[in-house]
Curated annotation (Swiss-Prot):
GO cellular component: membrane; plasma membrane
Name of the protein: Probable cystine transporter YijE
Function: Involved in response to cystine. Overexpression confers tolerance to excess cystine.
Subcellular location field: Cell inner membrane
UniProt keyword Membrane, yes or no: yes
Transmembrane in keyword set: yes
Membrane association type: Multi-pass membrane protein
Outcome of gene disruption: Deletion increases the sensitivity to cystine.
Name of the coding gene: yijE
Periplasmic side: 30-38, 93-98, 149-150, 207-218, 267-268
Transmembrane portions of the chain: 9-29, 39-59, 72-92, 99-119, 128-148, 151-171, 186-206, 219-239, 246-266, 269-289
């Protein structure tokens, strides 16, 4: 049996730490909106994140060879500029917990895009999960009482999830055509490309003047060192030492912990209707995760 198939306490601990790091990053992302524009922060986050990732790449002796440009740029635009940039923009007027949940609808978009572009058939359980998620989204959005600001935030958060899902399809095609591509190298180069793109966006789009408070520096340090370099290193370690089905639990745990952290630290009470929608989305995520696990077990040789 491979190491990834065994119960590894150290890897499970790494998964817990990883989940907490990525969950708490939503709190910093929300708090920093009071001092810096969404695109300025995303650009700086990508710049420092790329710097730290390339240092990690050098320390691990992986070399600096660029990954396939076309796919890497597409992932940078969709995953980092699209997912992170849109989520940060959504947080300007939206709550951290709500934005986290809507961004983490990504697995549903992956299922839909895989059916449309990769020819993967939707199973009955996936149809059911998508219906549950759609109803959950309806309850979270509460369109009967939305104003423009909350509607804008919700749509940006959903588009963040859509963009993230599209990046997963691009990544699948990349791995199909270049199976030996190194994940850490890919992450580093796409972060560099995203830093360049977001820097241009930040220069072109008018935003609030940056108020260089300690929160901004703490948020940048947290994003670059913990949420990027350490978290991705932990993710690689977790993937190597745990089954993919267990590693994918972070897809469920991060938005849930994000909601709990925002409730506890930011006083964001979702209310009965929105809370019910969040529960339904998490249930649907669990169903999609279970179906993925079954599909992987069938396809393994």
């Amino acid at each position: 049996m491979s190491a990834a198939g065994k119960s590894n306490p150290l890897a499970i601990s790494g998964l817990v730490v990883l989940t907490l790091i990525w969950s708490y990053s939503w709190i910093f992302m929300k708090q920093v909106t009071s001092y810096i524009g969404a695109f300025d922060f995303t650009a700086l986050r990508c710049i420092f994140g790329a710097l730290v990732l390339f240092i990690v790449l050098l320390l691990r002796g992986r070399g600096m060879r660029p990954t396939p440009f076309k796919y890497t740029l597409a992932i940078a635009l969709l995953q980092t500029c699209g997912m992170v940039g849109l989520a940060q923009w959504a947080l300007v007027s939206g709550g951290a917990g709500k934005v986290a949940i809507l961004s983490y609808t990504m697995p549903f978009w992956v299922v839909i895009f895989a059916a449309l572009f990769l020819g993967e058939r939707l199973r009955r359980g996936q149809y059911f999960a998508i219906l549950i998620a759609a109803f959950g989204l309806f309850l979270v959005l509460q369109p009967w009482q939305l104003d423009f600001s909350s509607m804008k935030s919700a749509m940006l958060a959903i588009l963040s999830g859509v963009s993230w899902g599209a990046s997963a399809i691009v990544a699948k095609r990349l791995y199909a055509r270049h199976p030996r591509v190194d994940l850490l190298s890919l992450t580093s180069w796409q972060m560099l490309y995203a830093a360049l793109v977001m820097s241009v966006v930040a220069l072109l789009v008018p935003q609030r003047e940056i108020d260089w408070q300690p929160t901004v520096f703490w948020a940048l340090a947290y994003s670059a060192i913990l949420a990027t370099a350490l978290a991705w290193s932990l993710w690689l370690f977790v993937l190597k030492n745990l089954p993919a089905s267990i590693a994918s639990l972070s897809t469920l745990a991060v938005p849930v912990c994000g909601v709990l952290f925002s409730w506890w630290l930011l006083g964001e009470n979702p209310g009965a209707v929105e809370g019910s929608g969040i529960v339904l989305i998490v249930l649907a995520l669990a169903l999609v995760s279970r179906k993925k696990k079954e599909a992987v077990s069938v396809k393994r040789i």
